[in-house]
Amino acid sequence: MSKIVKVIGREIIDSRGNPTVEAEVHLEGGFVGLAAAPSGASTGSREALELRDGDKSRFLGKGVTKAVAAVNGPIAQAVVGKDAKDQANIDKIMIDLDGTDNKSKFGANAILAVSLAAAKAAAASKGLPLYAHIAELNGTPGKYSMPLPMMNIINGGEHADNNVDIQEFMIQPVGAKTLKEAIRMGSEVFHTLAKVLKSKGMGTAVGDEGGYAPNLGSNAEALAVIAEAVKAAGYELGKDITLAMDCAASEFYKDGKYVLAGEGNKAFTSEEFTHFLEDLTKQYPIVSIEDGLDESDWAGFAYQTKVLGDKIQLVGDDLFVTNTKILKEGIEKGIANSILIKFNQIGSLTETLAAIKMAKDAGYTAVISHRSGETEDATIADLAVGTAAGQIKTGSMSRSDRVAKYNQLIRIEEALGDSAPFNGLKEVKGQ
């Protein structure tokens, strides 16, 4: 009943209006899995390759017909007849057939779409929700938790057309007792922030991930307006709501210095930028900082981990790119204490689960994440619950591509009840 009988790839549109790959995997018995690959804007240099056509006459070169052709041709031929329940085998077949270190022959976007679609089809054939199937693949059947959301309510950097350097300013509703309550709290702060920004004559247009993208006097001002909104919404900063940031520092790393336009083009060394961030953590209850330095600045990261690693969560995104080889090196060298998990950085479900396991086994936390280019595909919600990862980043309280994930989490929490606890701040490293 779980034998693959047909695989279909197609080019669809993501939340930025760019093409991406969608795959359908059909099994005996009529079971079907449908999944789409996301796409990043600020990308780590060591990510698996997202294959684009490069034909400027079509979608400005961003078409994915080559990746779709790989799905409909060699990938389909290789996996038809195979058992979709054997996820590791399906993924290995595709990876081996691609034969490159970074999936550049078929594209990580092609391989991932089929990998996730196969998992969804297998779950359907077993009569299980996707999160339950993922828990079984993870070797942790029946072990679930609801993730603490990091809600990106002010967008900067590569995710917005404004003068804010730091890419994401996030709130975490740690005072909530349930995921559903956390979403309500986040929504209330999000709408209150709009009023605060309007009262200051600032714009409330949103960026790629649904957060506001105003021009601000400095990076610290983003934290100040969020603090004002939290209070105006009736919550206590540090008790009900904590803060998190994604610096995406590789985006403003130039000639060995961190150059911040929002700070008057001031240039910082690794140590100076670490202390700049440390000062912000003393002013505001920031409990998590992602990519606080450039992905190649491992000496700087070692220093940053020494200074901040016992106090807050330091998440590696561009730093680790969901890659177990790189993560292993980071663990051995004591770099950061958490990993951001993005399916398409590595390109298959099996490799994603391996990265989560390696992180947890080493005492690192794992934060499940969307990309700035998303679709209505909500698989990351099931991944977060099915691996009991504990934390999720899936944008703000607007844009259907973001809200789709929150709504799926609401459904899952309703289905699982007490068997999927919401642990709040306990999930965050250092808290």
From Swiss-Prot:
This is Enolase. Gene3D superfamilies: Enolase-like C-terminal domain (3.20.20.120), Enolase-like, N-terminal domain (3.30.390.10). SUPFAM superfamilies: Enolase C-terminal domain-like (SSF51604), Enolase N-terminal domain-like (SSF54826). Mg(2+) binds at D246, E290, D317. (2R)-2-phosphoglycerate binds at Q167, K342, R371, S372, K393. One of its GO terms (molecular function) is magnesium ion binding. The active site is at E209 (proton donor), K342 (proton acceptor). GO terms for cellular component: cell surface; extracellular region; phosphopyruvate hydratase complex. The keyword Transmembrane helix does not apply. One of its GO terms (biological process) is glycolytic process. It is found in: Cytoplasm; Secreted; Cell surface. Belongs to the enolase family. Catalyzes the reversible conversion of 2-phosphoglycerate (2-PG) into phosphoenolpyruvate (PEP). It is essential for the degradation of carbohydrates via glycolysis. Pathway: Carbohydrate degradation; glycolysis; pyruvate from D-glyceraldehyde 3-phosphate: step 4/5. Its cofactor is Mg(2+).
